[in-house]
């Protein structure tokens, strides 16, 4: 996203972001997710309750398919990580921001940075809790800030075309 923002006038970037966020938020809401933050072209989303992992994966697949069909100026990758978070107000009293905090937030962002456009990178716990049709075999990746590698599986939007 940084290079896209650098190479385009702010008006075009805002137009792109509005189109992208409209697609993403509509789909996340449809699958019962909660949008915590919009940061650049990224969303921080939380799924809770029954079938949370499956709904997160289904939403991610639907987002990548919708972005591809919309022929937006650029694609995106998605990181999914299952773990604990806490919700709370963070910041000085004059500017509190209600958000989710926890290692899971950091890990999902790290997995997102490992995803190519049109791709989901999900940790094994997320995959083991959901139907993993179309995902690659397990692989281990190094994640910034971690000493141990993390087991993940990948899914690419092109898997939908192969299924059809």
Show where each model-derived region lies.
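Catalytic NTP-binding/metal-coordinating core of nucleotidyl cyclase/transferase enzymes
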Residues: 1-58
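Cytosolic regulatory/linker segments at or just downstream of nucleotide-handling modules
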Residues: 114-164
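Structural scaffold positions in well-ordered secondary structure
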Residues: 24, 40, 56, 63, ...
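Catalytic/regulatory signature loops of cyclic-dinucleotide turnover enzymes
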Residues: 70-71, 103-124
